[in-house]
Amino acid sequence: MERDAFERSLKAFTRRTPFHPFVVELVSGGQLQVYHPEALVFRNAIAVHFSQKGIPTLFDHQGVARMVETVEVSSPT
């Protein structure tokens, strides 16, 4: 992902009000689930994601394929 797009996307996703979870899809095929805006820290095209267990993952704009909103699937009634 281009550096400018990376920074714009992270800002947009983390600053939404109200916040909605989103997924960072990596070029390696991995996914980072961002459930809270404070679970992600970024500066100068480098980011650190903290999982719900507190495990940090470092990534940069070159390792990101795209970012997408998490879609909640409701159960049938």
Residue ranges and their predicted role:
Residues 1-77:
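Motif-centric detector for short Cys/His coordination patterns
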